[in-house]
Amino acid sequence: INEDKGIRWLLLSRKVKNNYVIRGVLVVINPESLIENNYIRAAEEDDLKKIEEIYNREAGNISKVFLKFGECSLNRVDPCVNIDLKELGIPCTPEQMIKLIKRGNIPRYYKERKECYDEKQRRMVADKNSLYLETKSSVINFYWKYAKQGEKHPNYSKRESSRNVIRLEVQCKYLKLYALIKNINEESKYDESDEGLLRDEMYLKMYEGMYNPVIPIDIVLSAKIYETIICKNIYKILRQGDYFTLDIARNIVESYCFRSGKEERMIEVLESVNESHGIAKAKSKLRKDEIVRFNKALKELDTIWVNPVTIPRRWNIKHIPNLLRTYYDARCEEYLVTKYEEYVMNHIAEVLKRERQ
């Protein structure tokens, strides 16, 4: 029950029909803190075996009736990646990167959490060092790791190593998790049949509040699911393009010599997002029929790696690579560039070269 170990044990109790009471134990694990008292590094699939060993030992010390690690079901998981801007050669500060992220394509069904009280405005406002978006089934959280450590663990000896780190995190609650893995449970080494019920029957009972099918731990923590969760949710907000100043972004679009309607649509979105200081803000001003045109342009800009969010001129930075794509490219040492990707990269390089002349 020592939180400093990276594991907490919470007793749960709920009254159901006919005065029956269901009791259980909720275990909250911070993998890196559990393994090596590290509050910065993100856990990976290879850490699972060590986590299982420590959990089973701690559970056995508390009670022999506690389930083994593989017999438990996941209720929530927080896939994340740490991106060190300096290490990847990304030429902006963490504060600047968070500002760009806040201008991203925030879906209307996500609500931004207001975490700080502003004395001047006399109201709660969003944290300047993070973007915290939530729905009933998930949370997407982007934050500067160094600033967050200053709030939670200001005296942590390794805090300095997080000075240039941006963490991208997706917190998946039970319903989102089950929807992701319901058809691949059998791939788990822990999977067992659930009272003979078919998957679809279990899903219906879950929605009716009668049944919670087991979510195997190893399936969700596998790279297959982990990276799918991160890429799908993070790219939705960041988009897939690099950041440029408005003039350079416009020049890249024009360098393709698209038909006039397509080029006009893409540049129109670049200018609208720049003027509104964000994709979501620009989209909020549009009528329903205009949103269709706007979304089409977003996808077209993705294909040429131009982000709709542009770099403020006062920063004196011409190009900032896409955060998530740069991270995955660096991890894949044998990454093979497709002909189309090479074509897109050459367009960007040519325009930037002309800007330097």
PLM segments and residue spans:
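Structured, helix-rich domain cores that form ligand/interaction pockets
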Residues: 1-282, 303-357
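Alpha-helical DNA-recognition elements
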Residues: 297-300
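Helix-turn-helix DNA-binding segment
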Residues: 291-294
